[in-house]
C-alpha cells in the first residue's frame, strides 16, 4: 500500500513546476488549434500595425530613397516563379527602362494583408517576404511574392479588385498531395485494424479468465486489469476519433486555402462562452488521456509484480494486489486531473486534443518515467533469467540452445513490458520529417495497436492451464450433449460387468454418478482380492480410475506450465522468493525459459 501514499506527493512534485512555468498560451513546436492560430495572427497584426505607423511617419524623401526598399526587393527583370514555373512579364513601363536600372519615385506602401506584413516595395520590382513562422502549417523555408508597379502601387489581379500575391511556396504543405494522403490513409488503416483486433481478442481473453474459477488468482487478476486497460485504450481512441471528426472528414479539416487563412485572421477572438460547445470533445480527449496513462501504468504493474516475485523474500500477493490496483488506476487519475485543471485555467482553447505548450509535460513526464522504469525492470529480469538458465542447464545443452531459450523468454516478456516504446521515446514525432517520420509513425502505429493482441495471445490463449480448462469444458459439453441426444431417442444401455440391460428411460431408477450411460469400456476388467474394482474405488497406493463421474473438477489439477502460463494453485501463498517451495519456484521459471 506504499504506492497509495506516494501518489499525492508525486503528483504535487510534478504539477508545481508546471504551474510556475505555464506562461505561454501556445507552443510553436506543436500542432495548434484554430483558436491558437487566431491568437498568433492577431498578435502578428498588432506588431505589423505598430511598424507601419513608424514607417509612415518617416519623411517622404527618406521613403523615396534607395534605402527604403533595397532589403526586400529583387531585380525588375522578368522572373520565373519557383513554385508554379510561370514567367511574369514586365509591364510596358518596365520595358522602357534599361536593364539593371533602378526606378526612383514613390514606393509601394507597407501593409498588412491578414496573413503577413508586407514592407515597402520598390517600383517595378518583385518583393519577396519569408513565409511567416507563426502559421504552423506553412513551409517556413519558402517565400511569398508581390509585385510593385512603376507607379508605386501593388499590382492587382487582372479582372479583380484585389492585390496579387503568390503564396504557393508557403502553402505547399497544405495541399492534398496524393502521396501524403496515401501515407495518412495507410496509418489510419493500420491502427484501426490493430486496435479492433486487439479489442476483440482481449474481450475473449477477459471472458475466459473470468469464467473459469480455477483461473482466479493474483497473477491472472493482474492480467485481467492489464487486458481491461488495453480495451479501454482502444475504445477511447475510437470514441475520440468519432467525436473529433464528426461532421467533417480529416482531409476537410486539414485543407486550408489562402482565402480561408484570411477569413480566420479577420475573425474576432472567440468569446469565453464558445468553450461550452467543446464540452463533449474535451471529455472524450480527457478520458482518452486517462486510459492511455492507465495502460502504461498497468504495464508497469506487471513488471513490478514479476520483479517482486523474483527478488522479494516475503511477498504477499493478495495483500499487494490492492496496492497495485490503486497504483494502476489511481495514480494516472491524479496527474490527469492536474492536467485538466491547468488546461482549463491557463489554456482553455479548442478541444484540448492538440498543443498546450509546456503543460503537456504534466502527462508526458509520468508516462515516460513508467516506460524507463519498466525497461530497467525488464533488463534486470532478463539478466536473472540468463543466470538461471546457465545454472540449470550447465553441461546438459550447448551454448546455442541456451541462447535460443533465452531469446524465447525475452521475446515472451517484451510485449508485457512494452519494450518497443523505448525505440523512439527520445525522438518526438514533431521533431522529425521525411522518411524517418514515416518509419517512426508506421512502427508506433503497428506495435502500439497490436500490442494488446500479442499480450492476449501469449498470456491467455497460449496458456497451458487455460487450454486445459477449455478442453475439459468442451469434453463435458460434448458428453452432456451426447447424453441428451440419447435420452431423447427413448432408450439407453447400461452395462454392469458382463450383463447388459436394455431398458426404457421411464423405467430407469437412480443413476450412477452424473447419470451418464455406462459402457464396458468404463469398467475395469481386473479384480482385487476376488472383488471387482468399482469405479471411484482404489486400494491405498494404487492410482484411482480417472473418470468424470469420480473426479470432481476442482481435484483434477492440470499440468502446471509455470509462473506466466501456469497453474494458479499455490501462487497466492504468503511466502515467496527463497521461502517458496522449490517445486513451485521451478515451475515459475519453466514458461519463460
Curated annotation (Swiss-Prot):
Chief location of this protein within or outside the cell? membrane
- The superkingdom of the source organism is Eukaryota
Locate the compositionally biased regions of type Low complexity: 540-554
Per the UniProt record, which residue ranges are transmembrane? 187-211, 220-241, 283-307, 321-342, 358-382, 407-426, 435-462
Tissue-wise, where is it found?
A: Expressed in most tissues. Most abundant in kidney, bone and liver.
| PANTHER family the record matches | PARATHYROID HORMONE_PARATHYROID HORMONE-RELATED PEPTIDE RECEPTOR (PTHR45620:SF27), PDF RECEPTOR-LIKE PROTEIN-RELATED (PTHR45620)
Protein name in UniProt: Parathyroid hormone/parathyroid hormone-related peptide receptor
Amino acid at each position: 500500500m506504499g504506492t497509495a501514499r506516494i501518489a499525492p506527493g508525486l503528483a504535487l512534485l510534478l504539477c508545481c513546476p508546471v504551474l510556475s512555468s505555464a506562461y505561454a498560451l501556445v507552443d510553436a513546436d506543436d500542432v495548434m488549434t484554430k483558436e491558437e492560430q487566431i491568437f498568433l495572427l492577431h498578435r502578428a497584426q498588432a506588431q505589423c500595425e505598430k511598424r507601419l505607423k513608424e514607417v509612415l511617419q518617416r519623411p517622404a524623401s527618406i521613403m523615396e530613397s534607395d534605402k527604403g526598399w533595397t532589403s526586400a526587393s529583387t531585380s525588375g527583370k522578368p522572373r520565373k516563379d519557383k513554385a508554379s514555373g510561370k514567367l511574369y512579364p514586365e509591364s510596358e513601363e518596365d520595358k522602357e527602362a534599361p536593364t539593371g536600372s533602378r526606378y526612383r519615385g514613390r514606393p509601394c506602401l507597407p501593409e498588412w494583408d491578414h496573413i503577413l506584413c508586407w514592407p515597402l516595395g520598390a517600383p517595378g520590382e518583385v518583393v519577396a517576404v519569408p513565409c511567416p513562422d507563426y502559421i504552423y502549417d506553412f513551409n517556413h523555408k519558402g517565400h511569398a511574392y508581390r509585385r510593385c508597379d512603376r507607379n508605386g502601387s501593388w499590382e492587382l489581379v487582372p479582372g479583380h479588385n484585389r492585390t496579387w500575391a503568390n503564396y504557393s511556396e508557403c502553402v505547399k504543405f497544405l495541399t492534398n498531395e496524393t502521396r501524403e494522403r496515401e501515407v495518412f490513409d495507410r496509418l489510419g488503416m493500420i491502427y484501426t485494424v490493430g486496435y479492433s483486433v486487439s479489442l476483440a481478442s482481449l474481450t475473449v481473453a477477459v471472458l475466459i479468465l473470468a469464467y473459469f474459477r480455477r483461473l482466479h488468482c493474483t497473477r491472472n487478476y493482474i492480467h485481467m486489469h492489464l487486458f481491461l486497460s488495453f480495451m479501454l485504450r482502444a475504445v477511447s481512441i475510437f470514441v475520440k476519433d468519432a467525436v473529433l471528426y464528426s461532421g467533417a472528414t480529416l482531409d476537410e479539416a486539414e485543407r486550408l486555402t489562402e482565402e480561408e487563412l484570411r477569413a480566420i485572421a479577420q475573425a474576432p477572438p472567440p468569446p469565453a462562452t464558445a468553450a461550452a460547445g467543446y464540452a463533449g470533445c474535451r471529455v472524450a480527449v480527457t478520458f482518452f488521456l486517462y486510459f492511455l496513462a492507465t495502460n502504461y501504468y498497468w504495464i508497469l504493474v506487471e513488471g513490478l509484480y514479476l520483479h517482486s516475485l523474483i527478488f522479494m523474500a516475503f511477498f504477499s500477493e493478495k495483500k499487494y494486489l490492492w496496492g497495485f490496483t490503486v497504483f494502476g488506476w489511481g495514480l494516472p487519475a491524479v496527474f490527469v486531473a492536474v492536467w485538466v485543471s491547468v488546461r482549463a485555467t491557463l489554456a482553455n482553447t479548442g478541444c484540448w486534443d492538440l498543443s498546450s505548450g509546456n503543460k503537456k509535460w504534466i502527462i508526458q513526464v509520468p508516462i515516460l518515467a513508467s516506460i524507463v522504469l519498466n525497461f530497467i525492470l525488464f533488463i534486470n529480469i532478463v539478466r536473472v533469467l540468463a543466470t538461471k538458465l546457465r545454472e540449470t542447464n550447465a553441461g546438459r545443452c550447448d551454448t546455442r540452445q541456451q541462447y535460443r531459450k533465452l531469446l524465447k523468454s525475452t521475446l515472451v516478456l517484451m510485449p508485457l513490458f512494452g519494450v518497443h516504446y523505448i525505440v523512439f521515446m527520445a525522438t518526438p514525432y514533431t521533431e522529425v520529417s521525411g522518411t524517418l517520420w514515416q518509419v517512426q509513425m508506421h512502427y508506433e502505429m503497428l506495435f502500439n495497436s497490436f500490442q494488446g493482441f500479442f499480450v492476449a495471445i501469449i498470456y491467455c490463449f497460449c496458456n497451458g492451464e487455460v487450454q486445459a480448462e477449455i478442453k475439459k469444458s468442451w469434453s463435458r459439453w460434448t458428453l452432456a450433449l451426447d447424453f441428451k441426444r440419447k435420452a431423447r431417442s427413448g432408450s439407453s444401455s447400461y452395462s454392469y460387468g458382463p450383463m447388459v440391460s436394455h431398458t426404457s428411460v421411464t423405467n430407469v431408477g437412480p443413476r450412477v454418478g452424473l447419470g451418464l450411460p455406462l459402457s464396458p469400456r468404463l469398467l475395469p476388467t481386473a479384480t482385487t482380492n476376488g472383488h471387482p474394482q468399482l469405479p471411484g474405488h482404489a486400494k491405498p497406493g494404487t492410482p484411482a480410475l480417472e473418470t468424470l463421474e469420480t473426479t470432481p473438477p476442482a481435484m483434477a489439477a492440470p499440468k502446471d506450465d509455470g509462473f506466466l502460463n501456469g497453474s494458479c494453485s499455490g501462487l497466492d501463498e504468503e511466502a515467496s522468493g527463497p521461502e517458496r517451495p522449490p517445486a513451485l519456484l521451478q515451475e515459475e521459471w519453466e514458461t519463460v525459459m
